[in-house]
Amino acid sequence: MLHPSYNDLMQVVNSEVEPGEQPVVNSRYSIVLATAKRARQIIDGAEPLTESSCNKPLSIAVEELYKSKVKIVSEDDENENE
């Protein structure tokens, strides 16, 4: 079982959303994609943003997301910033 759970991660990610606004993530799939993308960044040499007892990039990515060290942005927002 994943700790924190998908539901816990979704609550953390959506915690800054104002009432009436669209949630940042609506599904577990979004969490999986975001953590996988961050894990690939770590594998490619990005520095972890949190201290972790784990050496696995995916575990580090999950922990970063849970501690709000990384934010999930939509592809539309990402393209606007480029």
Swiss-Prot record:
Similarity-based family: Belongs to the RNA polymerase subunit omega family.
Protein name per its UniProtKB record: DNA-directed RNA polymerase subunit omega
Which GO terms fall under molecular function for this chain's record? DNA binding; DNA-directed RNA polymerase activity
Example of a GO biological process term = DNA-templated transcription
- According to its UniProt record, the EC number is 2.7.7.6
Spell out the Pfam families in the cross-references: RNA_pol_Rpb6
Q: Main role?
A: Promotes RNA polymerase assembly. Latches the N- and C-terminal regions of the beta' subunit thereby facilitating its interaction with the beta and alpha subunits.
Q: Does the keyword Iron-sulfur apply?
A: no
